[in-house]
């Protein structure tokens, strides 16, 4: 029987960030702050692939396609790696494709995206695979990865600030501040993406850019 297990990810409530934003944007409704925060995290995740989910999949005899859906209100951005898993050792990575039309080729293992959903095709039955996914939050997300607060707090806040200041006809509206925070967010995304590729060896990326007043 097929077995799909998602590794647990440490989480924190959105309030950890919302408390800071509500102090800065005192006239903003809570729902607007929450929406801006989720949108900012999703943008950052798409640009950097810093939000990951690890899946262990054991294939079932006669079944070729497997749908991988994170259980924590996350959407899959991309499959980052797939390896055969033997206890504590990995073999791979395996060949990956992005078109279901290619699924008849002679490669042993194929991964592709079908209608916006991640599908895993593994002809070898009874084999366990370790799959790493890049993900982003959906609108229903009520918690976020604790790594965002530990490593990318200012990046997330700057992303939310850029969206909030860009809103028209608000007491706090300021295109100048919105553009400044957007540039700061983009610089932070570039740094975070490099840090993620290096395995977070450079340490936390917090408050690397000056605040905008």
Per-segment meaning from a language model:
Residues 36-101, 150-165:
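Divalent metal-cofactor coordination and adjacent catalytic microenvironments
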